[in-house]
Amino acid sequence: GVHCNGWKKKSDEFYFFFAKRSKHLNDFPNLYDNLVGGGQPSGISIYENLKKEAFEEAGIFQLKKKYITKGNTINYFHNHKNFAFSGIIFVYDYEIYKDINFKNMDGEVESFYCISVDKLFTLLEKKKLKPNAIISIADFFLRNLSEYFPKKGILEIKNILKND
């Protein structure tokens, strides 16, 4: 599916925008997720799905192309409820260039948060992020903020995300 990091830079500090998932969802309730994300249906392009999900998840009526960056396409495997799953994430980044009041339209999101990089690490430590949301965030860091990781860590993450 598509996963879109919402981000902005203010006074040389990066901030990420997250959607807190509804407590009523069966999978990963109350966890923080990428600003926009959703499965890829057949019959529409990945970019059209990004626009659809941006509206449904965050009430973004029009994504401005000049603020969108295509990240990597990442294959991954995970275990959930004693089952193994595979997936593909089409990573996008959306620079939040002005103040936006995000509004969920499909009932899957409880609220939205803007979080500094330092607080992002706290969410990771406390396991408050939806597991596959971490993949697109790591991709963003590798492409834009690699100075936050030790060189050995960068090599390990790149090796994990490599699609061989």
Predicted regions and their residues:
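Generic beta-strand structural signal
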Residues: 1-5, 14-17
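Terminal peptide-recognition signature
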Residues: 4, 54, 92
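Active-site segment of metal-dependent pyrophosphate-handling enzymes
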Residues: 7-11, 22-25, 59-101
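Conserved Nudix-box catalytic region and its N-terminal flanking loop in Nudix hydrolases
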Residues: 13-56, 60, 69-72, 160-164
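Nudix hydrolase/Nudix homology domain
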Residues: 24, 30-32, 85, 89-91, ...
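A short glycine-/small-residue-rich loop at the edge of a beta-strand within enzyme catalytic domains
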Residues: 37-45, 79, 83, 111
